[in-house]
Structures are given as C-alpha cells and as structure tokens.
Design a protein with these regions (language model features):
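Conserved RNA-binding domains used in RNP assembly and mRNA/RNA metabolism
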Residues: 2-95
Length: 95
C-alpha cells in the first residue's frame, strides 16, 4: 500500500511564502500589506516587514475590493485568529 502524505497545513503554506509580498485581510475593509518575514506557531501568527495598513473599498461597479488608501507601518505581528484571508501578491510591488 503506498504511503499517503498528509496535506500541507496553513503553517507549511505560509512558510513556503516567507520573503514574498502578501496582503492580510482582517475584515471586509481593512488589512495589511508587506513582506512575510516569519511564521510563528505559539502564538499562531505572522510577522510582516515593510508593512502598510490598507483600506479596501468595493463598489457596485467594482465588487472586488481594491486598495483605496495606505498608511506606512514598520514591523507588524498579526495573530492568525484575526485573519479572514491572506493573498500572495505576484509580480511587481503594488506600492
């Protein structure tokens, strides 16, 4: 019988993206964008470097939320209990 591999956990998926630009959505209109610097298990969270707080807006004409404004931050720890969604940003920086 072939050995079955376990599916990757959230931590494995996050660890694969260390060093990449990500957007962390905390609620429908607020989140953070920055470079994923580290993943911790106790407490469960992520560290972002060169982070910015972002305000997201959606309209009837554009239902997918877009970044409406940004505010510079520095290093930020985000606990995974407060995260709704994490997006990996591919390509050139959106700053």
């Amino acid at each position: 019988m072939p050995e079955q591999s376990l599916p990757p956990t959230v931590f494995h998926m996050l660890e694969k993206n260390v060093g990449n630009q990500i957007r962390v959505i905390l609620d429908a209109s607020y989140g953070f964008e920055g470079t994923l610097a580290a993943v911790t298990r106790e407490p469960a969270g992520i560290w972002l470097s060169d982070a910015e707080a972002v305000i997201l807006r959606a309209t009837i004409a554009q239902p997918i939320p877009q970044v409406a404004s940004r505010e510079e931050r520095s290093e930020i720890f985000v606990h995974l209990n407060s995260v709704q969604r994490i997006e990996v940003i591919h390509g050139p920086s959106h700053r």
